[in-house]
Amino acid sequence: MRIKRSVHARKKRREKFLKSAKGYRGAIKRRYRLAKQHYYRAKWYAYAGRKLKKRDFRSLWITRINIAARQNGLKYSQLMHGLKLANISVNRKMLAELAINDPPAFSEYVKIAKEQLQKEAVK
């Protein structure tokens, strides 16, 4: 039978949590129970943060595209609809990069979107 609660295993487990709590302040870095709780909480926040990061970046890209599109006389939603009508599939990250680093190229996309929107309005 395998023994899971030996003194050696307990000490190793304890050291693992205390080692991971090295940068914490106060009792958290010295007390096993608190260190363990904060270790698990930190792991959960790290996991959740990785999910939130995706949301935050998408929101940032949309904001940047919207600002640049409005400077060129279109709203964000109109720009995206116009690009879809033109069968141009460029992702938001690249559009945001163009809007910041290469405004003339972004203006070309806006111009194409405007043309497509006008064609749709005529129909």
UniProtKB/Swiss-Prot annotation:
The reply to whether Ribosomal protein figures as a keyword in the UniProt entry is yes
Top-rank lineage group of the source organism: Bacteria
Q: Which GO terms of the cellular component aspect does the record hold?
A: ribonucleoprotein complex; ribosome
Q: Which UniProt keywords apply?
A: Ribonucleoprotein, Ribosomal protein, RNA-binding, rRNA-binding
Q: Which Pfam families match?
A: Ribosomal_L20 (PF00453)
Query: GO terms for molecular function, please?
Result: rRNA binding; structural constituent of ribosome
Coiled-coil residue spans? none
Q: Cite the InterPro entries for this sequence.
A: Ribosomal_bL20, RIBOSOMAL_L20_CS, Ribosomal_protein_bL20_C
A single GO BP annotation from the record? translation
Keyword Cell inner membrane among record annotations: no
Q: What does this protein do?
A: Binds directly to 23S ribosomal RNA and is necessary for the in vitro assembly process of the 50S ribosomal subunit. It is not involved in the protein synthesizing functions of that subunit.
The similarity annotation says: Belongs to the bacterial ribosomal protein bL20 family.
* Name the UniProt record assigns to this protein: Large ribosomal subunit protein bL20
